[in-house]
Amino acid sequence: MDLQDKRKPIPFISSFSFAVSGIMTALKTERNMRIHFISSVIVLVLSFYFSITKMEWLFILFVIGGMFALELINTAIERVVDLVTVEYHPLAKQAKDLAAGAVLVYAALAVAIGIVIFLPYALHMF
């Protein structure tokens, strides 16, 4: 049995194009992805406004990147489950609920980090 892949490797630029297409699809079709996007823009504007530190920037960028990545994974899991079965199945529900739960946990962490970073700046204004 030949284990070598006979297909031509996909050029790097094509891989990048597929990834961008996935992100754009999620932004167009997923309400929560749009909410995360708008929230991220607001957070970035606040970050510039308050001139946060380099360390705070690292946390903000990791939180934003992680949120987008996790939402994309959640969306992919939902799509695969929908592809596998159109009928209700408790395991399909669990898979979707688990993925959504992971996003919720990370979103709560993101909010907590946002409060820790921005609350002192906001309180300093008053």
Question: Can you say where each PLM-predicted feature lies in the sequence?
Answer:
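Divalent-cation-assisted or electrostatically stabilized phosphate/pyrophosphate-binding catalytic cores
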Residues: 94-97, 103
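Hydrophobic alpha-helical transmembrane segments
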Residues: 2-73, 88-90, 102-126
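Residue-level signal for inorganic ion chemistry
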Residues: 23, 78, 95
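Amphipathic, hydrophobic secondary-structure cores in small proteins
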Residues: 79-91
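Active-site His/Glu-centered metal-binding helix of metallohydrolases
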Residues: 73-80, 98
